[in-house]
Structures are given as structure tokens and as C-alpha cells.
Amino acid sequence: MSVPQSKTWLVDGFCRFTTRMVRKSFQCFAVQGLDQIPSIAASNCSLVVYANHIGWWDPIVAMLLRKKYLPDRVFYAPIDAKALEAYGVFRQLGFYGLKLETFAGASDFLKTSREILSDPKSSVWITPEGVFCDCRDLEQPFMPGLAHLAATTPNTIFVPLAIEYPFWQEPKPMIATRFGEPLSFQAGASKADCGKKIFESLRDTQRHLASSVMRRDFSEFDFVVAPKSQRLGLYDNLRAWKAWLQGRPFDPSHASINGKDSTSPGQRN
């Protein structure tokens, strides 16, 4: 398998399109762990970001995070080979086929990934669980490919990424993400040791994100897409009319019904 193309202009154009999709489908796109980004961006090492795998939106989340926070990194991501055949344009976006159910497929994945990561400006975004999992399932084992990769690419930084799609007060869910502590592995590191550290680091990152999600506090996050409340037809029009009669501004957020502060925050420092 040859190294896939990743045309930056096409990836960025796709990101502009999917940002509109996110705005339409989600209340906001929130992120934590940005204190890790400056050292990662400045590093002369290639990058692997590995995330839990909840559903269809995960690759879009990865692409938008790369564009927003790591724009100088070239985007690559393994994807099921059958899906890649169905959506051939993805080959131009840095996606490459994955057939881990066979020895030859696993070997191709490792060979292609190593070739990609030989470029210090590259980034591979991967979901090592291999199947869709609930974000609270912290026991699902990882497929072995990532541990093999970590043990054989010493000049690469590995960064865990936790993802959730929770509902808060609004009718649409939010995207909640968190970057964890970067890892690197010395030449000669054992596959077992790499696999253990990678697994534990992602699960710890998921736990931290889950705690924040359950607190429902926007001030704990930065935003790729900031929160925005929307009116819901007749019900919210009546609420707006009532607010006008009472001489107060109308807050369309449903948190305001319970007397909670629901103002959309700006970026945190």
C-alpha cells in the first residue's frame, strides 16, 4: 500500500463544509487540554492522536481539531477499506484503507503508517478500539496495531483524545473533547509496555472529560464552535413575548428556565 495523498487545500475545504454541518447538528464543539498543544506543534516529531470511537462523527471531529489547533500537521487517518472503496474522494483527504482482520492487512497498516510518520510534519488520527463503543465503556480492549506502531516509531508523539456527544439543557447535543498528556517511546520499548501506557492514558483522559461533562459547566472548556441557543417555534416565541412584557431581555437557552447562567462563554485563556 502506497502512502495516501493528503491535499491540504481539499482537507481545509472539507473542514469548512463540515463546520457548517456541526453548527447545524450540535449546540457547540468544546475542547479541553489545549495546554498540550504548543509543545506538540513546536515538536520536530511526527504525531499520532488516538481517540475512543463513539460513532460516525469521529473522523470529522478529528479533522476539525487538526485544522483549528495543529494546522501545520498533514492529516492522515486509517479507515475501513470497504468504506474507502465506497467514498473514493477520501483518498485525497489523507484516509487509507484498513483490513486488520487479516495478517496481510495488519502488515500493510503498519508499513503505511510508518512511512507516513517518517515525515515529522505528519499526523495520524486513529481509533484503536476498532468498533463503535459507548464513551463510558472503559474496558473495551484496543486492537494491537497501535501498540506495534508505538514500539517501532521512536520519533513520534502519541496523544490521547477523549470524545463524547452529550446532551445538556438544549435540544441538540454538544461535541465534548479533551487532549490528554502526550507520550513518547524509546527505541526498543516493548509492545506490551507501549500498549499498556496507551490504553491507560486514553482511559484516564476519558475519565477527566466525563467528570467535566457531568458538571455541565461551559467555563471548563474552550470552543471550536461556540455555544448558541436557538428558539424552538411557538414555545420560545411565547417565552420571548413574556420577557418583553416583563421588560427584560429574552434568553433562548433552556438553562435559563431553571435560573442557571447560560450565557455563551468566550475563549478561556
Residue ranges and their predicted role:
Residues 31-34, 83, 107-110:
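Structural motif corresponding to alpha-helix initiation and N-cap regions
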Residues 41-103:
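Catalytic core of membrane glycerolipid acyltransferases/transacylases, capturing the structured
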